[in-house]
Amino acid sequence: MTANIPVITIDGPGGAGKGTLCKAMAEALGWHLLDSGAIYRVLALAALHHHVDVESEEALVPLAAHLDVRFISTDGNLEVVLEGEDVSSEIRTQEVANAASKVAAFPRVREALLRRQRAFRELPGLIADGRDMGTVVFPDAPVKIFLDASADERAHRRMRQLQEKGFDVNFERLLSEIKERDDRDRNRAVAPLVPAADALVLDSTELNIEQVIEKALQYAREKLAVA
């Protein structure tokens, strides 16, 4: 029964460090990993590969229901595998991003992907990375963590990432975009970005990633020992 398979949900706003934390925890525990944020991009890419109209809800639903996708974390790197092929770079293109925003607008597609995400719950356990993992997708998860950081700190982290890749970045614009996205996510009607009532809220503003990983793993192991 899947309810007996442990899940650790990691929710929170963009830039809080969820991805890095989830990869580290999946590797430390030897568990499966779900990057829910990439799911819509993977579906969009699958639709493009199979010449499925990304504006047809009817055509997208069966594709979403049987989406063949896996997430593999090795040495801190996440590999996104679609139908046996590494598509980690391909899902980051603008074409896929545009298509993803279209497929995500369909309620029946979202419902099909909700069921598909729950199917990732396999032994020995699952680390689920997202924004509504603990509130909507896995409300019965024994361990829920809401990873947060100030908008200012998240903007600085994002700026450093982009500068390392050679991009010229305007900090104030980045900060404004992050605040706007936070506002949209926290105030949307469906699955708003809020901590689950039983989640540990972990503020990473003053912590480095090693400290975040240590605190999260310690909390998870304590909770799982008594679950």
Swiss-Prot record:
Main location: cytoplasm
SUPFAM superfamilies listed in its UniProt record: P-loop containing nucleoside triphosphate hydrolases
Species for this entry: Klebsiella pneumoniae subsp. pneumoniae (strain ATCC 700721 / MGH 78578)
CDD domains: CMPK
Catalytic activity field: CMP + ATP = CDP + ADP; dCMP + ATP = dCDP + ADP
Descriptive protein name: Cytidylate kinase
Cellular component GO terms held in the UniProt record: cytosol
Pfam families the record matches: Cytidylate_kin
One of the GO BP terms on file: nucleobase-containing small molecule interconversion
UniProt EC number: 2.7.4.25
Positions annotated to bind ATP: G12, P13, G14, G15, A16, G17, K18, G19, T20
GO molecular function: ATP binding; CMP kinase activity; dCMP kinase activity
Keyword set, alphabetical order: ATP-binding, Cytoplasm, Kinase, Nucleotide-binding, Transferase
InterPro entries, per database record: Cytidylate_kin, Cytidylate_kinase_dom, P-loop_NTPase
Cellular localization per UniProt: Cytoplasm
Nucleus is among the record's keywords: no
The family this protein is said to belong to: Belongs to the cytidylate kinase family. Type 1 subfamily.
